[in-house]
Amino acid sequence: MAGDSEQTLQNHQQPNGGEPFLIGVSGGTASGKSSVCAKIVQLLGQNEVDYRQKQVVILSQDSFYRVLTSEQKAKALKGQFNFDHPDAFDNELILKTLKEITEGKTVQIPVYDFVSHSRKEETVTVYPADVVLFEGILAFYSQEVRDLFQMKLFVDTDADTRLSRRVLRDISERGRDLEQILSQYITFVKPAFEEFCLPTKKYADVIIPRGADNLVAINLIVQHIQDILNGGPSKRQTNGCLNGYTPSRKRQASESSSRPH
């Protein structure tokens, strides 16, 4: 399928007169959001494309953590700062950046250092693309941001799986110890998921149980994106229906999967 997708993307004209198609991807911590996005990009044949010419790009909400004060940074280094709260993100910059993307502008994305809990001086340049995937635990929390997405995906993975993934990730990639990870999870991550992330699941057009392992759902999404890129009949028709999947069928599929809590 990847080969066919790559050929399709190479031949298409930019949809809707150049306006990019924004897709929001939400879900709990370590639910597989970035893996789902990476799988979509892979199946669309974009992995080997030069970054200046990519037609599908991924942005992460994690890049937009606020610059912390000295006091906040000291708490963060002890695992006592809540990075899962909406106020932890620079929401004004997120909104400004996404609006500029919808206008077809080249944007500069911050780079966040999860070891030192600080924003680096360098930025990443993102050039105009046809499809932009924006993933994050609170991607749907702000209505202003949420309303910019033409398609909204929620990655629904059970709590035990998410916790085990987070432990492995934070130890190997972020230099944390197990005690700190578990304390932070119980104190901040789990309560924030239940209060801020899980309630936004209702805004999703498509719910993806089991994340990147759910190839059936991902292939349907890829097919829909291909239709959008080619200006097909399903272009921008995502609210309530995706390739024949109605809202009621969507909910039934999500209810049959494991709930996070």
UniProtKB/Swiss-Prot annotation:
Binding, substrate: 84, 112, 117, 166, 176, 184
One GO cellular component term noted in the UniProt record for this chain: cytoplasm
Biased composition, class Polar residues, residue ranges: 1-16
GO BP field: cellular response to oxygen levels; CTP salvage; feeding behavior; response to axon injury; UMP salvage
Modified residues (N-acetylalanine): 2
Modified residues (Phosphoserine): 254
E.C. numbers: 2.7.1.48
Keywords: Acetylation, ATP-binding, Kinase, Nucleotide-binding, Phosphoprotein, Transferase
Pathway where this protein functions: Pyrimidine metabolism; CTP biosynthesis via salvage pathway; CTP from cytidine: step 1/3; Pyrimidine metabolism; UMP biosynthesis via salvage pathway; UMP from uridine: step 1/1
Listed GO MF terms: ATP binding; cytidine kinase activity; identical protein binding; uridine kinase activity
Region annotation Disordered: where it falls in the sequence: 1-24, 236-261
Residue numbers binding ATP: 27-35, 213
Catalytic activity: uridine + ATP = UMP + ADP + H(+); cytidine + ATP = CMP + ADP + H(+)
InterPro entries to which the protein is assigned, alphabetical: P-loop_NTPase, PRK/URK, Uridine_kinase-like
UniProt note on tissues of expression: According to PubMed:8812458; testis-specific. According to PubMed:11306702, placenta-specific.
Main EC class the enzyme belongs to: transferase
Pfam families: PRK
CDD domains noted in UniProt: UMPK
PANTHER family given in the database record: URIDINE KINASE
Subunit-level organization: Homotetramer.
Family named by the database record: Belongs to the uridine kinase family.
Protein function: Phosphorylates uridine and cytidine to uridine monophosphate and cytidine monophosphate. Does not phosphorylate deoxyribonucleosides or purine ribonucleosides. Can use ATP or GTP as a phosphate donor. Can also phosphorylate cytidine and uridine nucleoside analogs such as 6-azauridine, 5-fluorouridine, 4-thiouridine, 5-bromouridine, N(4)-acetylcytidine, N(4)-benzoylcytidine, 5-fluorocytidine, 2-thiocytidine, 5-methylcytidine, and N(4)-anisoylcytidine.
The protein's name in its UniProt record: Uridine-cytidine kinase 2
Source organism of the structure: Homo sapiens (Human)
Organism phylogeny: Eukaryota, Metazoa, Chordata, Craniata, Vertebrata
